[in-house]
Amino acid sequence: MTVQHIVLFSFPRELSAAEAADMRAMVASWPKEIGLMTKCRFGTDLTGARTRGYPYLLYTEFPSEEALAEYRAHPVHQDFLAWLNARDCTPLAFDYHLDGQTVLMAE
């Protein structure tokens, strides 16, 4: 069953333009480097007015919980986590199944 994985990222200070570009480049490499997800999106909030300090969002979908677990353990993802930890990032993650209970409007 498809799993949606959403993560919000908060940092104690604003990332530099170079750091923000590095973060985006790392995530952009995942479809080729990791290859387990069926969707991968990453962006920043448009206004910052309602983010409560979480200006970055990662949206991914995986074909199964097993694929999500493989992604979490993948060395490329582990390198990303180390990059986040080096910047004292506070992530907020949420995973759930995409099924008849959660899909309220089909694509």
What is the role of each PLM region?
Residues 1-56, 63-73, 89, 96-107:
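Short S/T/G/P-rich N-terminal loop/turn motif that feeds into the first structured element of a domain
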